[in-house]
């Protein structure tokens, strides 16, 4: 799988921390088979951090990068080369190359119905300074959107009225380097429910507040997280 490229720690990590794994579209041809795993969020984060902190030749610094630093590649020329990055604190890290893994934080906005907030997901701040720096270097920004379903407290749910959905009996690892026998473990079920006339009524009465229909957000998507 493509997750095994460049070391593939994401695939290895989900194999260690998934709570359910399922191969989707198995009734169709192999070209559309899609492996889906759901993780214990805290375990995934802790395990990935442990791996990073114990990786040789990797130094970790926590800071908000606000500026990409460059200089002319040739005297009098228009082309530029990277010289480093600058943090919001003023600290400068010199380098010859920069890899940006920005996720969904460049100029991020979170939209809840008719409320829009200039922030990243889960209350984490958006990388607005870095966004401005990239624009200054001639890099165009396009808006992508994701849709995140509401999180429900399991204590408020009547599971007896829902359909239980199990993970695969024989789990396929995400990483080719994972021993398949190490991922055969007890899993957490998913649960399926349906809308009804009441939920349809609520939706119809509030369509004008939905950013997908009101035009409040634009961009390619959506992707559900």
PLM feature spans:
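Conserved N-terminal/central alpha/beta ligand/cofactor-binding core
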Residues: 1-69, 89, 101-121, 125-131, ...
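Active-site helix-to-loop segments that bind/position phosphate- or nucleotide-bearing substrates
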Residues: 206-225
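Conserved beta-strand-loop-beta-strand element in the redox core of flavoprotein oxidoreductases
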Residues: 67-92, 98
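Core structural elements
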Residues: 98, 102-103, 225
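Intrinsically disordered, low-complexity regions
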Residues: 30, 77-78, 85, 168, ...
């Amino acid at each position: 799988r493509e997750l095994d490229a460049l070391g593939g720690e994401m695939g290895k990590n989900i194999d260690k921390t998934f709570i359910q794994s399922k191969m989707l579209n198995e009734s169709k041809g192999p070209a559309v088979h899609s492996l889906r795993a759901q993780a214990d969020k805290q375990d995934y984060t802790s395990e990935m951090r442990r791996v990073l902190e114990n990786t040789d030749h990797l130094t970790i610094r926590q800071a908000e990068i606000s500026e990409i630093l460059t200089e002319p590649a040739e005297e009098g020329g228009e082309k530029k080369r990277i010289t480093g990055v600058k943090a919001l604190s003023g600290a400068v890290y010199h380098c010859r190359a920069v890899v940006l893994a920005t996720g969904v934080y460049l100029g991020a906005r979170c939209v809840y119905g008719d409320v829009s907030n200039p922030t990243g997901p889960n209350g984490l701040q958006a990388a607005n300074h870095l966004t401005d720096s990239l624009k200054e270097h001639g890099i165009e920004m396009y808006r992508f959107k994701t849709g995140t379903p509401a999180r429900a407290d399991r204590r408020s749910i009547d599971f007896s009225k829902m359909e239980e959905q199990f993970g695969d009996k024989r789990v396929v690892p995400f990483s080719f380097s994972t021993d398949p026998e190490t991922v055969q473990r007890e899993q957490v079920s998913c649960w399926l429910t349906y809308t009804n006339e009441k939920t349809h009524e609520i939706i119809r009465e509030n369509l004008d507040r939905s950013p997908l229909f009101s035009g409040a957000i634009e961009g390619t998507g959506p992707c559900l997280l």
